[in-house]
């Protein structure tokens, strides 16, 4: 009988304390591009893929605002699950920090990436076509640590 009681207690403790869940420590950002027009409007687009939340991603993230100012403080990706922020203030596409933070869920995530047009893979071109003052694009997939 002692063996049976011990076995039941061991089995119950195994179910009470599940193994640690493996988590991914990066967000993948693809299709990352931004541009400004000659009338000072700015736009940014990227796609977030998060291995920790496969049911919510990939999701598009799109921003429109007046260049030289900051986008809306509580801007979110299209699925509403990621805040988009620029912690260094108003965005200059030649040098800026992008911050993403998961709005809710069991795995908290917040990460930043600094981008500079002076070094690949973030590339910016001045006056690429009529009406566009600056056009920038990330070559490849950006992996943001969270």
Task: Give residue spans per PLM region.
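Detector for Asparagine
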Residues: 5, 20, 25, 52, ...
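Acidic, low-complexity intrinsically disordered segments
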Residues: 69-146
